[in-house]
Amino acid sequence: MEDYNNQMDHESSGGRGNFLYASPNLGGNYGRAASDHQMGINTFHLQSSGGGGGGGSGDQCNFQSPGTHPINVKTEATTSQHGHQKFQYNNNNNSHLVSSSRGHQPVIHQLQNNFDLLNDDHSLSSNEVEAIKAKIIAHPQYSNLLEAYMDCQRVGAPSDVVARLSVARQEFEARQRSSGTSRETSKDPELDQFMEAYYDMLVKYREELTRPIQEAMDFMRRIETQLNMLGNNNNAPPLRIFSPSEDKCEGIGSSEEEQENSGGETEVPEIDPRAEDRELKNHLLRKYSGYLSSLKQELSKKKKKGKLPKDARQKLLSWWELHYKWPYPSESEKVALAESTGLDQKQINNWFINQRKRHWKPSEDMQFMVMDGLHPQNAALYMDGHYIGDGHYRLGP
């Protein structure tokens, strides 16, 4: 929250403002004497100030409602030249300013637990201050205003802080019921406008606080899901970035009424993104397992196509080089080659067929022999460097 306040301070210095409420008669003179200076425009914003109850010109009064703790309120004196009025709320060691000024960009900051809507002034007597304070506490909008403020405090707060805020709210309501304070319809339009504007400002402030925190938590949950999906391959235990208490957003955007209507917070069960895929896979395996098994066996029986053994190829190439002019082995030669290479005759036939297609072209003499009707395999004698019969005897060159 401190980082967020620092960021908002930086933005305000750059001329950026949030939640501007302007009205000629919106709370500018509320609780002040008729002789005070009129302001042309009133803007309400929260501005961080440095600690304590604050000094400066002005008096400090203590207001206390029946059954409540004292409330410190301070007004800083201003002049008509500045047109500037500040409502300062003090609580513990921190102080925040609700400013009503002209020409200054509004900046939203965290409110304190016991915020006030009045300022002391030299022109107001103690009786008048008590009367104004009683009007604010008795205003019908005061309960909603307090609830909106506590919702802002819940945003991003740890679970123990959220619990303390809920207890404080319940104690306040109990004191209000025991004191018998009635909240009749307000007859002060100026006070109505001030309470309504302040309530709207707190609601918008809560929305601005909730949005970045919710987006950050959604992003971390997506990262958590992706990491768990990657870890499922290694059977790793589920990864949780948020603890169970943090996973409930620590009171983000939740009021006491919302928690009561929901019957308490319940942890959303984790959804395995791969459960549906695994279920489909198991169903297909059960349905087609028999067919897949038979297909696997059939494929395993088939020999993969590959090259012949190196030694066998070398012996076939040696025979090829010796019989290049007529590379047609006889049946007896095929049997001999099969025995020497360890191949069957089908493999030998296929090898010679492919080898002749790729690397052999008949000579002109062989082409004439084929054209004359002399089958080469039946030729008992072929001169010009070829073999006689089975090729064991060779004639002269």
UniProtKB/Swiss-Prot annotation:
Subcellular location per the Swiss-Prot or TrEMBL entry: Nucleus
Residue segments, region Disordered: 43-68, 172-191, 233-276
Positions with biased composition (Gly residues): 49-58
GO terms for MF: DNA binding; DNA-binding transcription factor activity, RNA polymerase II-specific
Span of domain ELK: 279-299
InterPro entries in the cross-refs: ELK_dom, HD, Homeobox_CS, Homeodomain-like_sf, KN_HD, KNOX1, KNOX2, TALE_homeobox
Reported function: Probably binds to the DNA sequence 5'-TGAC-3'.
Family to which this protein belongs: Belongs to the TALE/KNOX homeobox family.
Name of the featured protein: Homeobox protein knotted-1-like 2
